[in-house]
């Protein structure tokens, strides 16, 4: 029986070659979308977060939806997702981002969404049985939100919230928000914006929290649609001060996301900006990714030309992930052709271990992953110990890429 099981693939390969067909080369990721993700080819799935909603020890998927109700996809333990309709209500909103954390300290993960045009941010408390209770009234304010980050910024052990605001419409402010968890009432928030953030009317699309200067607290990188991007240092108590002298911004950028991770392997976090040429309009700015390398003391120098391939597509989202299992962080990014807003194949860039990246798309990403790729989430969905990627889509099918032995 073993000999037969080995011989059959060889026969199939030989038959394919004899007929003039070349077998498709295997890629690091397998596109499991058709069998594992609920079909929704016109959905605007702008972001996703992985969290074990129902306590069965696998990762479920929470999806932020623009122009529809936010979604919950339950995992069967093998990465096959089923839509639990109405988990976050049925009202349509303009949700842009989603994150999960245990805000009320009950051991169950809660979910926060930020919304743009309708300013309908939403907050749901996790409940037993994989259910959620709407607690949106606990959020301190409404805004035209486009960025979201969660982390303990004041050292009290509770998750706090940063909302990045765009203020692109008349009468709306681009002042970003800082909401501190209320230690006296876990699951409630105190608006610390006025006392803790610079008073700046920005056009923020993304926010990242990380210890940039090595002092043990969470600092902030702000990604803006209109320049400049910003670096804010934390005083340890959750009060932030901008330090533009630490951020080497050599060209004007229209940035959608900031990622903070150790690209160069020196133990210090670096900053990656994912950029557009314009928001689906004409060609304006250089959309190539920018990698700013930490000098070890919290100052960041733009070394993009030496470390990243030149590209011309626009990128609304991406993620660092070790897809080749060598211990350093590679990159998977969405690509959209602008002008035109035309869908493109997802792209992959391999890290050589020192922060120099080469295009590995053909070896890593299945060719059918063409779409307007949006927010991504990374985690082991199918329980094989290997990280997978859920990729949102703007008016194209959200995708699930299952990792193989090379992606850990």
What is the role of each PLM region?
Residues 44, 68, 94-96, 144-149, ...:
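Beta-rich catalytic cores
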Residues 375-408:
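Blade-level signature of beta-propeller repeat domains, shared across WD40, Kelch, NHL, RCC1
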Residues 59-65, 111-115, 161-166, 220-224, ...:
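Hydrophobic beta-strand segments that make up the repeating blades of beta-propeller
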Residues 36-66:
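Beta-strand-rich domains and repeat architectures in extracellular enzymes and scaffolds
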Residues 17-43, 74-93, 125-143, 179-202, ...:
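Blade-edge motifs of beta-propeller repeat domains
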Residues 56, 60, 106, 110, ...:
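Acidic carboxylate motifs that coordinate Ca2+ or other divalent cations, activating on Asp/Glu
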Residues 46-55, 96-105, 145-155, 205-214, ...:
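Beta-propeller blade termini
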Residues 68, 117-119, 167-170, 227, ...:
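Short glycine/acidic-enriched loop and turn motifs that connect beta-strands
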């Amino acid at each position: 029986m073993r000999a037969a099981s080995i011989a059959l693939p060889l026969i199939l390969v030989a038959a394919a070659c004899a007929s003039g067909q070349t077998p498709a080369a295997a890629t690091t990721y397998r596109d499991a979308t058709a069998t594992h993700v609920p079909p929704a080819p016109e959905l605007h799935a702008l972001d996703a977060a992985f969290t074990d909603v129902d306590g069965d020890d696998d990762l479920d998927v929470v999806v932020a939806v623009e122009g529809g109700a936010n979604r919950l996809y339950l995992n069967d333990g093998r990465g096959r997702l089923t839509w639990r309709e109405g988990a976050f209500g049925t009202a349509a909103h303009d949700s842009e981002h989603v994150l999960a954390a245990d805000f009320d300290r009950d051991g169950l993960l809660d979910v926060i969404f930020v919304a743009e045009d309708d300013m309908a941010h939403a907050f749901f408390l996790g409940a037993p049985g994989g259910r959620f209770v709407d607690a949106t009234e606990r959020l301190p304010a409404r805004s035209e939100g486009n960025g979201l980050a969660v982390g303990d910024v004041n050292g009290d052990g509770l998750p706090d919230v940063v909302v990045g605001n765009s203020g692109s419409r008349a009468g709306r402010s681009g002042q970003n928000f800082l909401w501190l968890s209320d230690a006296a009432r876990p699951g409630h928030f105190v608006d610390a914006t006025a006392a803790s953030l610079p008073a700046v009317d920005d056009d923020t699309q993304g926010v990242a929290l990380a210890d940039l200067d090595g002092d043990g607290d969470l600092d902030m990188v702000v990604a803006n649609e209109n320049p400049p991007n910003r670096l804010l240092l934390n005083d340890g108590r959750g009060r932030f001060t901008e330090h533009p002298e630490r951020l080497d911004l050599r060209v004007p950028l229209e940035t959608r996301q900031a990622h903070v991770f150790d690209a160069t392997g020196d133990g210090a976090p670096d900053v990656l900006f994912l950029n557009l040429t314009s928001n689906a309009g004409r060609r304006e700015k250089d959309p190539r990714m920018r990698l700013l390398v930490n000098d070890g003391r919290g100052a960041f120098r733009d070394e993009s030309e030496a470390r990243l391939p030149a590209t011309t597509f626009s990128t609304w989202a991406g993620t660092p992930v070790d897809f080749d299992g060598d211990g350093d962080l590679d990159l998977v990014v969405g690509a959209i052709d602008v002008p035109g807003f035309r869908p493109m194949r997802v792209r992959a860039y391999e890290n050589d271990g020192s922060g120099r990246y080469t295009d590995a798309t053909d070896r890593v990403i299945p060719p059918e992953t063409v779409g307007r790729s949006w927010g991504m989430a990374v985690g082991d969905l199918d329980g094989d110990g290997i990280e997978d990627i859920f990729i949102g889509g703007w008016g194209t099918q959200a995708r699930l890429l299952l990792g193989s032995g090379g992606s850990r």
